Amino acid sequence: MLDYIPWIGNGYRYGNGYKGVAGAGHSATNGSPAGNTSSTTQSNDVAPTFSNVGVGLKANVQGTLGDSQTTTVGGHQWPTLDPANLQLWTGAEWRNDSKTQNNTTTNENHTKFASATGSGQQQGSTTTTSAGNPDSLKQDKADKSGNSISVQEATSGDNLTNYTNLPPNLTPTSDWPNALSFTNKNNAQRAQLFLRGLLGSIPVLVNN
């Protein structure tokens, strides 16, 4: 069973390989927080995910298929993605979320949307993270013990792994050179442009 939606975000750093690395085929976990799903791929297999162009979104499919979150439509209950478990990647290669603990370095990405008011239920546990206002993207820290990964909002004294709060407003034209440059992917404006492009909301500039 898929833990995450691979065609939206594979949870690994930028690259055409499964984990953005070249070389022989290798086996790795599919970004699963439990590390219980494995997949093997060859280096010439292109993973067509948003992660490969610096932005991605993943959602806990396993929890969804387990009916952890449902909605009623027409008298029938349908499983839905739990908004408390959506995760966003921007500039995944250049924002390396490695955290060294007990001489072990992990490469998992753990950026979460944090909402001041949002909370959700996931597999019987309550979480205070939700895919709410992207302006409240907080800096997280990730701790890994065996196959278990815990992610919580970091404080100034923690070993920080992700972005601090994104700027409150990112206008499409605020930083065109950097946003459109393929040499500066750790760039919130570029990620915003890409997302706006997917949504068809970037204005077309006409040079008269």
Swiss-Prot record:
Listed Low complexity bias regions: 100-132, 159-172
UniProt protein name: Putative adhesin P1-like protein MPN_468
Start-end of Polar residues biased regions: 145-158
Region Disordered, residue ranges: 29-49, 97-172
Family membership: Belongs to the adhesin P1 family.
